Design a protein with these regions (language model features):
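Contiguous, well-folded functional domains in the mature portion of proteins
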Residues: 1-229
Length: 229
């Protein structure tokens, strides 16, 4: 009798597993989802399907909105404003541009790379586009994508952080205002879903990261003044 019960329970479990596998195919079944790393737990194709539908699985939203504490390294070096992959490092008309692409699985809270005073928070662009920001770095008007540009005055000159939208990420939250005094590593805003952050620096600073490297907001040192190198 006990053997029959065990066999029955096992059969029921197998049926449930098969049904869930079929319902969620080709995406992970809820039975194994928690055991998978984030990229496998929520594949890009599944996230884009949710985007088209306008609704998301609650577990992914809880993961996406995470906002871990960050401890900035000691010193006055310039920190990464966002989590992500460095996709472009260029100089144009005296400005050094560092482009960071955020994926769906990165923390989407942006942080100030330096301490200083906010001199400007401006909205730019009129369109939503896809891409990694390389072609957007030097554009300030149409066809530049919708974005928020936070300009910070420092002893080394003005530094700007550009939060750029995409077709997927159409909302930006900016948490600082003009004349605010901010500190290095402070939260300044958030882009909803994967997009791009551009850090604008004076040409005189010395970059410490290159294309292909991953960076973390408020923790990774990306540059420093030449006289500090």
């Amino acid at each position: 009798m006990i053997i029959l019960i065990i066999q029955g329970v096992s059969l029921c479990f197998l049926i449930v597993a098969v049904v869930l596998w079929g319902l969620y195919f080709p995406h992970p079944s809820p039975l194994i989802r928690r055991r998978l790393p984030p990229r496998a737990r929520w594949p890009e194709a599944q996230i884009r399907k949710w985007l088209r539908r306008g609704s998301f699985q609650s577990g992914f939203l809880n993961y996406f909105y995470r906002d871990p504490e960050r401890i900035p390294p000691v010193g006055n070096s310039i920190l990464a404003p966002a989590d992500g992959l460095v996709t472009s490092v260029e100089v144009h008309e005296g400005i050094r541009y560092l482009v960071i692409a955020l994926s769906f699985w990165d923390v989407h809270v942006q942080r100030s790379p330096v301490s200083g005073s906010v001199v400007k928070v401006e909205s730019k662009g009129k369109e939503f586009m896809d891409g990694e920001g390389r072609g957007f770095a030097f554009l300030m008007e149409k066809p530049c994508p919708v974005q928020q540009r936070v300009v910070i005055s420092t002893d080394a000159g003005e530094i700007a952080v550009r939060l750029i939208t995409s077709l997927a990420a159409r909302r930006i939250e900016t948490w600082v205002r003009e004349h605010d005094a901010i500190v290095r590593g402070q939260r300044i805003g958030r882009i909803l879903l994967g997009s791009t952050v551009v850090l604008e620096l004076p040409e005189s600073v010395y970059l410490l990261v290159d294309v292909g490297e991953r960076v973390w907001a408020g923790e990774t040192i990306v540059a420093q003044e030449m006289n500090s190198a």
